[in-house]
Amino acid sequence: MWLGVITLFPEMFRAVTDFGVTGRAVKNGLLELHTWNPRDFTHDRHNTVDDRPYGGGPGMLMMVQPLRDAIHAAKAAAGEGAKVIYLSPQGRKLDQQGVTELAQSSRLILVCGRYEGIDERIIQTEVDEEWSIGDYVLSGGELPAMTLIDSVSRLVPGVLGKQASAEQDSFSDGLLDCPHYTRPESLDGVDVPAVLLSGNHEQIRLWRLQQSLGRTLLRRPELLQNLALTDEQTTLLAQFVEAMNKHA
């Protein structure tokens, strides 16, 4: 996957290129990330990248000319078919379904705003989609961009050691993940569930599915409203609720 990022702080993206899963993906040639800094497209000696908004009010906007030139440079490097995304609190909220959709694109250009945002005409003429990572205020679009890159890259074939790792992540099937355990078998008197030590793969599968269903019901019940549960899932969830009520 090819990624271009428009940002005033390109050094922040070393967190993507140099570390963890995404860093390995870059090293292995599965992920290609380039940055364009609007400051490199300024024409004054101060490298000005902000400007006052029409109509007054507090704060500044990103200056149109350097930002637009940076976007054009990224588009030229990406070639035809690149999707331009502006990270914005007004955009569609990112969820696993959205991540799956974005992962179908081979080339993405992410525009990271700063200050009070960017000129609306840039959004109208240069941006294909707006995406948000949540209903809260951040200082810029860099952290949302890194969040999007990390989540999307996990679905790029070969990035994870095993595709099952992505398939078993929370939200991959619309449910929260089940609990996980490692050694020791007993920790401060709390034992690993016996079924996980049984070696019975079918029973382990059913237990994990039931725990995912139950955890989703208890912590994010609204997620279940969007799912068409199978007969197996419905039965397992009913058994979970029954057991929970017995121990209430």
UniProtKB/Swiss-Prot annotation:
Specifically methylates guanosine-37 in various tRNAs. The keyword Cytoplasm applies. GO terms for biological process: tRNA N1-guanine methylation. Keywords: Cytoplasm, Methyltransferase, S-adenosyl-L-methionine, Transferase, tRNA processing. It is found in: Cytoplasm. Its EC number is 2.1.1.228. S-adenosyl-L-methionine binds at residues 113, 133-138. It catalyses: guanosine(37) in tRNA + S-adenosyl-L-methionine = N(1)-methylguanosine(37) in tRNA + S-adenosyl-L-homocysteine + H(+). The lineage of its organism: Bacteria, Pseudomonadati, Pseudomonadota, Gammaproteobacteria, Alteromonadales. Belongs to the RNA methyltransferase TrmD family. GO terms for molecular function: tRNA (guanine(37)-N1)-methyltransferase activity. GO terms for cellular component: cytosol. This is tRNA (guanine-N(1)-)-methyltransferase. It comes from the Bacteria.
